[in-house]
Regions:
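Short extracytoplasmic/periplasmic juxtamembrane "stem" segments immediately C-terminal to an N-terminal membrane anchor
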Residues: 35-52
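Extracytoplasmic/periplasmic/luminal assembly and interaction segments
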Residues: 57-106
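Long, acidic/polar, low-complexity amphipathic helices and coiled-coil-like
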Residues: 95-290
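Short coil/turn segments that connect the beta-strands within blades of beta-propeller domains
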Residues: 225-227, 290-293, 335-338, 384-385
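Short, solvent-exposed loop/turn segments at conserved positions within beta-propeller repeat blades
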Residues: 239-250, 299-303, 344-348, 397-401
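Hydrophilic extracytoplasmic domains
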Residues: 307-444
Length: 444
């Protein structure tokens, strides 16, 4: 077979695959254009100028977005994209930050257990002493004061940078963050250790945990262009924890993402905004709608405080003291609005901060229905006194994707509806990017 015939057959095969794939994509997409609308409260006409966009993906080859108005006019429109090549969702760098634990667990073979320091030296010595006389299937344990064997909390930080279909992982050197934060475990904290030998005698299982409490955290760092921002919440540590020994003091920290190896440079870590840990009950940091500006939220004596932090100058641009909360609210960002969702009992409430003349202004307050689930991929939009809020949620009665939408104005809720798109919870179908919500532009 000559090379021209081989090339011809390859082109035919690609054409067949492409046409077949487009037919499959079209079939999948067309089956999901229909939107079922349920008006649960209020008047759907209040939502006529609202536009909702649902993005979905099937098997990394078919993408489609359906945009519709809750009122049904104009009719839903769907844009399709199909590719023979894989089109995985766009991914961003993210960081995981954990620590503050007085706990650890290991399972190791007898040889590894006796020769490798899988725990801090003093704890490893204690574990080996407990295991020394154990027969197969037996366990031994003890309690001790934390300061007798370990003095400072451990921390771990990992940065995952997207590279093609995978991620490159960068971590901090062992004990490097412990040396930076230098947070002592409170004296008098009781810790238990148990060691169990397997039935065949070949393995040891060690568990270290606090007595009468559970401490520690595992959360995301805030990754921007060149930096990872971190915070430490007193709510994640035992009562009485001392933060005064942190290098640079307690506050907002950042560490550069740039590195010549697979280790993050803890030596370049900075405390960029000093804060008083005695005033703070909880804290979180996130990106804002503007490049180079972060949102820093703190709970201080029961009141929520919002700061806008400028990365370039390391200064606070704006500072607001808001409502009272017993726990940190969920934050939903829109183009010109910041929505705070509270899960405090007995009811869920919201506060909308609208951007006016370069400032956030508390504009609307209300109560959301008590649901058994946390709001998933929420979106918010505001225009001329009307606040729209939407969230994806599993439908309890029918298969499909349920999306709930609320609209409020100064007088209260004016619309609450649910929208279903059939069969969207199939295994091969998933939301490729968050739900988008907007008001129709004037004259559009």
């Amino acid at each position: 077979m000559n090379k021209h015939m081989v090339l011809y057959l390859i082109l035919v095969l690609l054409a067949v695959l492409g046409l077949g794939g487009m037919a499959i994509a079209g079939g999948i997409g067309q089956a999901r254009v229909d939107i079922q609308v349920e008006t649960l409260e209020g008047d759907v006409e209040q939502a006529r100028e609202l536009r909702l966009t649902l993005p979905f993906q099937a098997d990394d080859h078919t993408l489609w977005e359906t945009t519709f108005s809750p009122a049904g006019d104009p009719a839903p429109t769907t844009d399709f994209t199909y590719s023979i090549l894989s089109m995985p969702p766009e991914r961003e760098a993210f960081a995981t930050f954990s620590g503050g634990r007085i706990s650890d667990s290991i399972v190791a073979s007898r040889e590894i257990f006796q020769t490798v320091a899988l725990l801090p030296d003093q704890l490893m010595t204690l574990a080996r002493e407990l295991a020394e006389d154990l027969e197969p299937g037996q366990s031994a344990g003890m309690e001790f004061q934390s300061e007798d064997y370990t003095t400072y909390f451990d921390f771990d930080l990992s940065l995952l940078m997207p590279k093609g279909d995978t991620y490159y992982v960068y971590t901090t050197p062992r004990n490097a963050l412990k040396g930076y934060f230098h947070i002592p475990i409170p004296d008098g904290t009781r810790v238990s250790m148990s060691v169990t030998r397997s039935e065949d005698g070949g393995y040891f299982d060690v568990l270290v945990q606090p007595v009468g409490g559970s401490y520690g955290f595992n959360k995301n760092g805030c990754v921007t262009d060149g930096w990872i921002y971190l915070v430490l919440s007193p709510a994640d540590f035992p009562e009485g924890t001392d933060f005064s020994q942190i290098r640079g003091g307690y506050g907002l920290y950042r560490i550069p993402t740039a590195t010549d190896s697979y280790e993050l440079d803890v030596g370049a870590m900075q405390t960029v905004l000093p804060l008083s840990y005695a005033e703070i009950e909880d804290i979180c940091v996130m990106k804002s709608p503007w490049d180079g500006v972060l949102l820093l939220l703190t709970l201080e004596h029961g009141n929520l405080r919002l700061r806008l932090f400028d990365e370039a100058s390391c200064t606070v641009l704006e500072d607001y003291t808001l409502d009272s909360y017993s726990s940190m609210p969920q934050v939903v960002q829109g183009e010109n609005v910041l929505l705070l969702l509270s899960y405090d009992v007995p009811e869920r409430s919201f506060l909308a901060l609208v951007r006016e003349d370069g400032q956030y202004v508390p504009s609307l307050r209300g109560t959301l229905p008590n649901k058994s689930y946390r709001w998933y991929e929420p979106a918010v939009a505001y225009r001329n006194g009307h606040l729209a809020f939407a969230t994806l949620s599993p439908d309890e009665e029918r298969p499909g994707l349920s999306m709930e939408v609320w609209i409020w104005e100064d007088g209260g809720e004016v619309f609450y509806g649910r929208f279903l798109r059939a069969a969207a919870w199939e295994d091969s179908i998933y939301a490729s990017t968050p739900l988008r919500l907007s008001w129709k532009e004037d004259g559009a």
